[in-house]
């Protein structure tokens, strides 16, 4: 847990350094970065594959879980637009254990920056939790509340706004990854177990937050 909170602190420091209240405050080097609603291939892939995805996973899910997935799908534009509205942070975009190197077994060095974007900083925390820890309510609440404390000390944001950012973040990159890999042909998968494992992990968050 100490190591996890250390990661959260370090990624928050990056988020806070590159925090942009509005479009005017963007520094020149960040102006070319895309926001979620400008990353067109996310929604294109989801729209093209959603029916196939539901068909493939329906036997693994209960009726309420399928309803949750369909509700997310039907509200993608709203979700993406809200997560693309300022204030925004410079985000890693694919934060998970394999993309973190620990210097001296303590200081995290973040690797693989190919998904960088402007987004809500907590989107990095959400993906880190899904990909890197076993689902545990106490740990999840500890991490999310700790990040909120760091954020609240620097910026004016209500807990309701923060929770909305968390829920939206659950429905963007994690949802994209889930639909993508669970609709992929088996012969294209390097790890045939990953899609189902990711689906099951993500559904635990959906069942908890929605």
Task: Cite the ranges covered by each PLM segment.
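Short helix/loop segment immediately N-terminal to the Walker
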Residues: 27, 84, 154-160
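Active-site acidic catalytic loop and adjacent metal/ATP-binding pocket
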Residues: 74-121
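Active-site activation/catalytic loop segments of kinase-like enzymes and analogous catalytic loops
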Residues: 118-155, 171-192, 197
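Protein kinase-like catalytic domain
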Residues: 15-19
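Eukaryote-biased recognition of C-terminal alpha-helical segments
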Residues: 192-200, 206, 210
């Amino acid at each position: 847990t100490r190591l996890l909170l250390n990661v959260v602190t370090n990624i928050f420091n990056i988020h806070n350094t590159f925090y942009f209240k509005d479009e005017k405050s963007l520094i020149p080097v960040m102006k070319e970065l895309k926001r979620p609603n400008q990353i067109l291939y996310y929604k294109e892939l989801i729209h093209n594959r959603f029916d196939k995805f539901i068909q493939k996973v329906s036997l693994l899910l209960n009726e309420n879980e399928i309803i949750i997935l369909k509700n997310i799908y039907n509200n993608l534009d709203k979700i993406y637009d809200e997560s693309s509205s300022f204030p925004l942070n410079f985000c890693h975009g694919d934060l998970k254990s394999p993309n973190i190197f620990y210097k001296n077994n303590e200081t995290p060095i973040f690797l693989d920056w190919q998904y960088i974007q402007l987004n809500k900083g907590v989107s990095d925390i959400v993906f880190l939790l899904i990909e890197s820890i076993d689902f545990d309510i106490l740990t999840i609440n500890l991490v999310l509340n700790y990040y909120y404390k760091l954020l609240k000390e620097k910026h004016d944001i209500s807990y309701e706004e923060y929770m909305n950012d968390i829920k939206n973040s659950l429905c963007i990159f994690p949802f994209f990854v889930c639909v993508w890999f669970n609709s992929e042909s088996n012969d294209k998968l390097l790890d045939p177990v990953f899609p189902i494992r990711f689906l099951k992990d993500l559904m635990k968050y959906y069942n908890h937050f929605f």
